[in-house]
Regions:
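Short hydrophobic/aromatic beta-strand or adjacent loop that forms the aromatic wall/cage
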Residues: 39-43, 160, 300-306
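Conserved SAM-binding loop
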Residues: 3-12, 86-202, 209-225, 304-310
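S-adenosyl-L-methionine-dependent methyltransferase catalytic module, highlighting the catalytic core
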Residues: 167-175, 185-309
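N-terminal juxtadomain amphipathic helix
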Residues: 1-78
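Hydrophobic anchor at the start of a short beta-strand
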Residues: 23, 122-123, 229-230
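Active-site beta-strand termini and strand-to-loop segments that position acidic
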Residues: 46-48, 308-311
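Short low-complexity, flexible loop/linker segments enriched in glycine and/or proline
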Residues: 40, 71, 137-141, 202-204, ...
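Conserved SAM-binding loop and adjacent beta-strand
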Residues: 74-88
Length: 313
């Protein structure tokens, strides 16, 4: 992983939503998930529209360098955790006899195989070829804009944890509107950019996440690209490990002391007696004040499932 990241190409970018190049820096973090501290990546917020994104970000040609070999491990239907997630995801779909569905970011097609067994006509697209692929599932590899589908073809299009990874969400919204039928739904899971997990606990999967959507920003994307927001669900239930902000008090306290990320993640920092006492109270605050169910209740949990309808005028 380290040798691959040495070849990473970074690029500055303007706001995908409004095109403005004016932004303010919010915070910077390295790749905390895979503990690579070579680069720190800056999360910025557009001054014009408020959209948050990564800049500089990995270029599209070098994105494959930041996906660990095990990134798609155990994402087939045989894995019990994945099958439970497929059941929960399917609950968001409408009941359509012989419906045609496209799953963007389908990996090896595990969710599509699950749906095929329930009568759906299944199609998939993913920009990474995985080591496994379900048999009998029609999957095109590459980015969605590079793959063609008929206009008004699909009843439902899904994207589970995808839109935050793509360089130009605007292009995806435009294409999805064209290939979705006039009564179709676009159903997608994204991190909640207003959540404790995302905004305050530094837990976004940076640099693989390059856009940080908030409800008001999703509504603006929908308006610009011919959709209406039908429903937004705030949920921590789709994954076995909830996207909770637990730990934010500890992390933010340590960062306020200018302790490097490598020491925070490896728990190798030294504190004075006074700071140790303060750190102890931060741990108490994390335990008492932050809970996944409360985060869901107050729309502060890390994930949202968004359902968009085409806006037919």
């Amino acid at each position: 992983m380290k040798s691959r990241v040495n070849n990473l190409s970074l690029e500055k970018t303007d706001c995908d939503l409004c095109g403005s190049g004016n932004y303010k820096n919010l915070y910077s973090v390295p790749d905390l998930r895979f503990k690579n501290f070579k680069h720190e990546y800056s999360v910025v917020q557009c001054i014009n529209c408020g959209h948050r994104y990564l800049s500089p970000r990995p270029s599209k040609d070098s994105m494959h360098l930041i996906y660990h070999d095990n990134y798609y491990k155990n994402r087939n239907e045989v894995d019990l955790k994945q099958k439970n997630r497929f059941i929960l995801q399917a609950d968001y779909l409408p009941k359509i006899a012989n419906g045609k569905i496209l799953d963007i970011g389908c990996a090896g097609g595990g969710f599509l195989k699950f749906l095929k067994n329930k009568g759906w006509k299944c199609y998939g697209v993913d920009f990474i070829k995985t080591k496994y692929k379900e048999k009998g599932i029609n999957i095109k590899y590459g980015y969605l804009p590079e793959r063609s589908f008929p206009k008004l073809f699909f009843n439902v299009i899904t994207a589970w944890g995808v839109m935050e990874h793509v360089h130009e969400p605007s292009v995806y919204f435009e294409i999805i509107n064209k290939i979705l039928d006039n009564k179709g739904l676009f159903i997608f899971l994204i991190p909640n950019g207003d959540s404790l997990w995302s905004r305050w606990a530094f837990k976004e999967d940076i640099p693989r996440h390059i856009h940080f959507f908030r409800p008001k920003i999703i509504k603006e994307y929908a308006r610009q690209y011919g959709f209406k927001v039908h429903k937004i669900y705030y949920t921590n239930k789709l994954y076995s490990r909830p996207a909770s902000g637990k730990g934010l008090f500890k992390r933010r306290f340590l960062r306020s002391l200018d302790i490097p990320w490598v020491k925070i993640i490896n728990n190798s920092f030294d504190l004075s007696m006074l700071k140790k006492i303060q750190y102890y109270f931060m741990k108490i605050f994390d335990a008492l004040l932050i809970h996944p169910k409360l985060e869901e209740l107050f729309h502060l949990c890390g994930n949202m499932v968004v359902i968009l309808k085409k806006d037919i005028k």
